[in-house]
Amino acid sequence: MTRRYECVIRGRSTASPQTLFALVADGSRWSQWAAPLIPYSAWESLSPAGDSGVGAIRAVGRRKRPTREMVTIHEPGRRHGYTMLIDGPIHDYQAQVTFVEDADGTQVTWRGRYETRWRAVGAAYWLILRVVLGTLTRKLIIAAERQDG
């Protein structure tokens, strides 16, 4: 039986949705704002349209064994989504980062979901994902606020 898991992290930023989106959508710059969690980042290939949109593949993590992620959602200023291109105990990992502007700034929501057949793997990965997505969300907000000055 396949089990589904989801982790949702929320944050608030004074930066604009456009600034937040520009940082998260540029796969080559993740190592600049997400270090030391992400020490390496690069575009492996661009989208069929020749940009960083849907279909582009980034490599993030360790230079020798990066994680490959394909962009699945590219809505500038609103949403960025990706899937991990991995084989292993988890399947169908999908993540998206959404930006909603309101009177107080921008609400940032980073959501990751995946499937696995093993309950222990699902629970352990959820704990790891909570730390990773929480760290990425905080680092993204800090970098965007510095950039917006």
Map each language-model feature to its residues:
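Glycine-rich portal/gate segments that line the openings of hydrophobic small-molecule binding cavities
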Residues: 32, 41-88, 139-149
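Short, well-ordered strand-loop elements centered on a beta-strand within folded domains, enriched
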Residues: 54, 81-83, 104-112
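Beta-strand elements of well-folded, non-transmembrane domains
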Residues: 13-15, 88, 101, 114-118
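Hydrophobic ligand-binding cavity/cleft-lining segments
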Residues: 1-47
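A conserved amphipathic terminal alpha-helix motif
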Residues: 113-149
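Coil-to-beta-strand transition motifs
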Residues: 4, 90-92, 101-107
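Hydrophobic/aromatic beta-strand elements that line small-molecule binding cavities or substrate pockets
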Residues: 9-11, 67-73, 93-101, 112
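A short, structured loop/turn motif at beta-sheet edges
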Residues: 14-18, 72-78, 98-107
